[in-house]
């Protein structure tokens, strides 16, 4: 009996190994989840299988926001050229002789589990007849608007300038009666200069002499009618909320009002952003057209190195960042020059919880890699432009994402 018991293999080492493997896998999954950006309201799209039941590259759930940039040394013909007249001079990196101006568009975004196709501008025009599309936000939304315009303009010459109420730019593609417009608004909410009243007041009693009045419950006049006019709306805000050159916290602070009265005690910009987002989201939900499709675009990243724009910061890279470098640039824990992008997104995601009327266009992750795609010194300013994007360039991919998501929404 003793001999038999000694010959039996012990199960303890095997059980120990299985426990170790299980713990390792759990820790690995936990770490992966902690490094990824929020999944809520992502640009995740469900595509049906092919008629024969086989899986296509777009089958199953596709999270377009996670992937990598693949260099194509022999890309297909460009979708539009640097001669598109709507391109703002400072963004025309090819004409401005930026070193990698031609190569910027050679990089293709490849999501992890599917493909993001380049949209067909002619098919888009044909399938969106009698449609109004509005971009509402700061100059980064104009960047995206110009990209879409140039791609559509490349396949049709029938065009007329026409601006809806409040719009800064607008065009109608006559043959298709499709209008696209850009409504400029930095904060979404109405704001303007504020100066102390000689007769005194609530803010004056606290020592405020001047600043900027921000009415958190009133949309800026540039887009107040946009949600009831456009069939498709793409909104953004973020960059101007932490702009000390404009809203100096001491010399010209943001002073928030609601219901026509100052919010007391005064609140910081981060809290003001939350108030504005909640109010503007409510406004759009109440005023949008029946069947209207509303997107909120996530924050576009900046890529300043060596300081901010007014501190000698530059962006001279000629290739996309590697994943590890992306975290150095943008991790909230590092609190670096460019951390604004993820901070703004936290506010955005919080404001859109349980908001079924909104679709989030998550361009942040794919854009965080593209430190090479800004105008930089070729922007013609007295400092590197590491905030806007070259055209042709990255915002063309934003529009691919926009169109792919739009088609899926309409197919549901």
Curated annotation (Swiss-Prot):
Membrane-traversing stretches: 9-29
Keywords associated with the record: Membrane, Signal-anchor, Transmembrane, Transmembrane helix
Miscellaneous note of the record: Contains 2 motifs that are conserved in esterases, but it is unlikely that this protein belongs to the catalytically active pectin esterases.
Record-linked InterPro entries: TBL, TBL_C, TBL_N
One cellular component (GO) term of this entry: membrane
Function recorded in the entry: May act as a bridging protein that binds pectin and other cell wall polysaccharides. Probably involved in maintaining esterification of pectins. May be involved in the specific O-acetylation of cell wall polymers.
Locus of motif DCXHWCLPGXXDXWN motif: 385-399
Major subcellular site: membrane
Family (UniProt): Belongs to the PC-esterase family. TBL subfamily.
Protein name, entry field: Protein trichome birefringence-like 13
Signal peptide per UniProt: none
Residue ranges of the motif GDS motif: 137-139
PANTHER family: PROTEIN TRICHOME BIREFRINGENCE-LIKE 13, PROTEIN TRICHOME BIREFRINGENCE-LIKE 9-RELATED
Annotated GO MF terms: O-acetyltransferase activity
């Amino acid at each position: 009996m003793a001999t038999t018991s000694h010959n039996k293999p012990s199960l303890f080492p095997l059980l120990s190994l299985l426990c170790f493997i299980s713990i390792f896998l759990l820790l690995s999954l936990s770490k992966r989840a902690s490094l990824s950006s929020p999944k809520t309201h992502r640009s995740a799209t469900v595509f049906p299988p092919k008629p024969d039941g086989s899986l296509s590259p777009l089958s199953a759930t596709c999270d377009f926001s996670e992937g990598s940039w693949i260099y194509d040394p022999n890309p297909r013909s460009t979708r539009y050229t640097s001669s598109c007249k709507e391109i703002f001079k400072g963004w025309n990196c090819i004409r401005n002789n930026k070193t990698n101006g031609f190569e910027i568009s050679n990089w293709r975004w490849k999501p992890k589990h599917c493909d993001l196709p380049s949209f067909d501008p002619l098919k888009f025009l044909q399938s969106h007849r009698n449609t109004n599309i509005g971009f509402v936000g700061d100059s980064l939304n104009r960047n995206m608007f110009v990209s879409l315009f140039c791609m559509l303009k490349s396949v049709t010459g029938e065009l007329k300038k026409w601006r809806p109420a409040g719009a800064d730019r607008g065009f109608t593609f006559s043959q298709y009666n499709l209008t696209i417009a850009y409504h400029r608004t930095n904060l979404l909410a109405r704001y303007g200069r504020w100066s102390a009243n000689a007769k005194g007041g609530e803010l004056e009693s606290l020592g405020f002499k001047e600043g900027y009045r921000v009415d958190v419950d009133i949309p800026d006049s540039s887009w107040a009618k946009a949600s009831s006019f456009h069939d498709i709306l793409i909104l953004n805000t973020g960059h101007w909320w932490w702009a000390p050159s404009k809203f100096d916290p001491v010399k010209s602070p943001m002073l928030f009002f609601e219901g026509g009265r100052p919010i007391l005690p005064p609140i910081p910009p981060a809290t003001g952003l939350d108030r504005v987002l909640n109010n503007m989201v409510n406004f759009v939900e109440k005023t949008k057209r029946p069947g209207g499709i509303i997107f909120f675009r996530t924050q576009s990243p900046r890529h300043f190195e060596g300081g901010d724009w007014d501190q000698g910061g530059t962006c001279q890279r000629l290739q996309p960042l590697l994943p590890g470098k992306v975290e150095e640039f943008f991790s909230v824990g590092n609190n670096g020059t460019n951390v604004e992008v993820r901070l703004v997104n936290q506010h955005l995601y919080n404001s859109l919880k349980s908001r079924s009327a909104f679709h989030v266009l998550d361009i942040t992750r794919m854009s965080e890699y593209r430190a090479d795609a800004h105008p930089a010194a070729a922007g013609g300013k007295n400092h590197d432009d590491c905030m806007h994007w070259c055209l042709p360039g990255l915002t063309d991919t934003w529009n691919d994402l926009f169109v792919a998501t739009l088609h899926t929404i309409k197919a549901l």
